[in-house]
Amino acid sequence: MLKNINPTQTQAWKALTAHFESAQDMDLKALFAQDSERFAKYSARFGQDILVDYSKNLVNAETMQHLFALAKETDLQSAITAMFKGEAINQTEDRAVLHTALRNRSNSPVLVNGEDVMPAVNAVLAKMKAFSERVIGGEWKGFTGKAITDVVNIGIGGSDLGPYMVTEALVPYKNHLTMHFVSNVDGTHMAETLKNVDPETTLFLVASKTFTTQETMTNAHTARDWFLKAAGDEAHVAKHFAALSTNGKAVAEFGIDTDNMFEFWDWVGGRYSLWSAIGLSIILSIGYDNFVELLAGAHEMDQHFVNTPFESNIPVILALIGIWYNNFHGAESEAILPYDQYLHRFAAYFQQGNMESNGKYVDRNGNPVTYQTGPIIWGEPGTNGQHAFYQLIHQGTKLIPCDFIAPAVSHNLVGDHHQKLMSNFFAQTEALAFGKSAQAVQAELEKAGKSAAEIAALVPFKVFEGNRPTNSILVKQITPRTLGNLIAMYEHKIFVQGVIWNIFSFDQWGVELGKQLANQILPELADSAAVTSHDSSTNGLINAFKAFRA
């Protein structure tokens, strides 16, 4: 069980509050000028392949000392131990939180209610391996005897975002199968996907633990109807559909052979499920051996997280710096900015991972918190973002801490593209940290031949204040293993922050109310009768919708 410790009542929080009075005027230029070893002191290496540079943050030794004290005073270590031991730390649902067991490559026992889960984890992995090898190798045939060419993953939330992000990130490792992902209940998503596939050579993966998720099952039945228009015989469904589920009865009723049902467990949260059977689409895209490398990379980070003192623990350091900005500097958002086109869904994935985990206003005692919890997470790949929203990060009025992520080695050595990409990666964090003074702007304008009047008019607009904080995460190359490292790093960062904020990070009750109301409204949309059962706004919207569609 997790302890209930209000972070604001700790001595460390009070010390941080006092420290902030002077630290809010901290200047990155001065910090670097005062300490030639700042980069060495405020950076960390993970193995041989990842460098995390957090030196361009508004922190000094005293800041970090108080932050580490906060982690200790909120008993973070016992929370880490409780999670990895399989205690029911998802207390509102009385569940263990063991996505880490899915990638436990040491195969050491992991107990839930006294039972080792590893034999079951390994059995599902072996089943996925055998299935994927038949599909990839062409042994698995469709209803006309043709091999599979396309795979459509039907899921939503964690059953979609994770597999989609990973398959996109690892395109350099993909095989001949073409992957498609359908999530939105908007029929357009499925309709446009079906235009690009052939019923004779398409395999559908229906990803729903309960096999009752409204969006997923609506899309699955649409895919089934489309398929049967071509195949005719319902017996053929079993050759073109597999299930990632635990509801054997519903899976069989759909027409799927339960031998092709891949289970996972209630101790696997949706947003942490890519490591489970939900990752079957990843295996079908990159092959089982590369999936194992992904698991191994995450396991390496798990071991680092469990065994490394907080002062050198990368997820802990990143989490604490995030708390410094969120709770003391008043930052409301964080940007994740990968300088790698293959990582174009990375920020979206951790938008869910972070905001669904820590978007909570009630603490573990059931009381409203009196402090800020989860930040808004957003971002796009560089350099696209530079020509879209970096203006606000550089010269806006909001403090937006940023994570810059880039590989040193590209999978596509096209001309000098990668050098140009990386020059921007390095330049942006330097510009954000150190800015450009009025004197430097004036000198530039004088050199350009501007008049004194023109210079006076332009200088204020061309000054960069700097002092915008960033982390730089430099990866040797994006591989299955290093991607596993990165994903687990961010997962554990989120966990650490939730522990310190005294909230439950592994439930998501905030998604329930809208679903309940949608189920009430759905039958009201079946006819043209005026609706009066809601507030005036909702009634007005529903009735306008009915009038528009008439």
From Swiss-Prot:
Q: Where is the active site?
A: E356, H387, K515
Tell me a GO biological process for this protein. glycolytic process
Q: Which reaction does it catalyse?
A: alpha-D-glucose 6-phosphate = beta-D-fructose 6-phosphate
- Locations listed in the record: Cytoplasm
Would you tell me the Gene Ontology cellular component terms?
Answer: cytosol
List its EC numbers.
5.3.1.9
Which SUPFAM superfamilies does the entry link to? SIS domain (SSF53697)
Offer one Pfam family short name for this entry: PGI
Keyword Nucleus included in the entry's annotation: no
Q: What does this protein do?
A: Catalyzes the reversible isomerization of glucose-6-phosphate to fructose-6-phosphate.
Q: Which family does it belong to?
A: Belongs to the GPI family.
The protein depicted here goes by the name Glucose-6-phosphate isomerase
Q: Which organism is it from?
A: Vibrio cholerae serotype O1 (strain ATCC 39315 / El Tor Inaba N16961)
This protein's gene is called pgi
